[in-house]
């Protein structure tokens, strides 16, 4: 199964509101966000475009690439690269898709970020938890989005 078939229900344009906790990267904020997941490269890739707008008009932009994980042993195994305005070179996050949930873990020298995209009754929820250094895992972002347009 191609990654586009695997993530079919996630494809589309979404917009909503996010609650972001204070972190070493940014102060706490309530933001507006838009994200798009679309198939590309004959369905072998899903591309993600993301835009977050803060009350102070500051923006955070990201471009993601999702591919099937050829070495993944779990059904629905995926790899995700997320390039963003922090200009850090990303390593791949590893994760799985199943039961309407895409769970991914990105690891860097700063720590790890645990991402969960979940489809719930036609809406998309996004949760990001951070583990920085030897600190315990803490909630960082919670978002709720409505589908603006389909696949």
Regions found by a protein language model. Name each.
Residues 1-151:
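Hydrophobic small-molecule pocket/channel-lining residues, especially in calycin-type beta-barrels
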């Amino acid at each position: 199964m191609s990654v586009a078939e695997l993530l079919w229900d996630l494809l589309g344009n979404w917009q909503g509101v996010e609650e972001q906790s204070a972190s070493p990267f940014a102060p706490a904020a309530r933001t507006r966000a838009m994200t798009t997941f679309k198939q590309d490269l004959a369905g072998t890739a899903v591309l993600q475009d993301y835009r977050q707008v803060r009350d102070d008009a500051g923006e955070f932009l990201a471009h993601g690439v999702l591919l099937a994980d050829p070495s993944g042993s779990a059904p629905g195994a995926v790899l995700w690269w997320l390039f963003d305005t922090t200009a850090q070179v990303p390593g791949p996050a590893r994760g799985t898709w199943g039961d309407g949930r895409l769970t991914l873990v990105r690891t860097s020298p700063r720590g790890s970020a645990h991402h969960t995209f979940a489809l719930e009754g036609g809406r998309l929820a996004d949760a990001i938890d951070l583990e920085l250094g030897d600190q315990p895992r803490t909630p960082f972002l919670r978002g709720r989005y409505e589908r603006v347009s389909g696949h």
